Amino acid sequence: MAVICYALRVKIELMKFSMEIRQNIIESHDRVWDELAKPGAVLSGEERIAVAREIRAARTCRFCIENKGSLGLSPGLGEHESTDPSFPKARLELIHRLMNDPGRITRAWVDNLRAEGLGDVEYVEIASLVSSVCVVDTFCEALGLELRPLPAAISGKKNYKRPATAEDEGAYVPMIAVDMLQDDYSDLYDLNHWVPNVHRAFSLIPDVVRLADDLMASHYFPYESVPRYADQNHEYAVSKTQMELIASRVSINNDCFY
């Protein structure tokens, strides 16, 4: 019922602004919300919804806002704002740093999270939730739409199997190399084209890569098309020059220099 009500509100808002959202974007957001409610590789459905609540709360965290203006790598004294006092501190720190100050993520900081009990698979799962929920929420905000209500958690446990070929390549978490695809993740990358590291970043959880690819393709282009697309390859209302200008400005504003 909540989904139906949300769809009706979206339709009303779109009629108000005479704007049409591409169907593939709506469908990709629906898939993000469907997956959000399900048990993940490490987190239960309830824990994933709790992470989503903290993602939304992190955007107005006063402690993060104050630290953003500091010059050092270490944060000042204080605590992150949270919706739940019992929420695990290591998870909270990861969410807030990814949301508000990713430019100051260091290996020492990641190692400290590990020392506090945050495993590499858990790190990747939470990072993927931050990424996907942020995409959906900021899209709604940009169009003046209400945020989607968080879904009800689905009980159960996912049967996660760690990829046998995921290895430490010097990054902060293990990844699957382009020549190490096998089994149920043999099609994870398009090997006909260059595979950037950002495409492999979530590969410790292959299903997360697939969901991220889905968002990437619906909002922009598939990874393999990015270096070579031209205006004749798409039917978007904006040109390649306009898209890349917007992407560059957003990246700069978010301290993303990839």
Label for each model-derived stretch:
Residues A2-Y258:
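Hydrophobic alpha-helical segments
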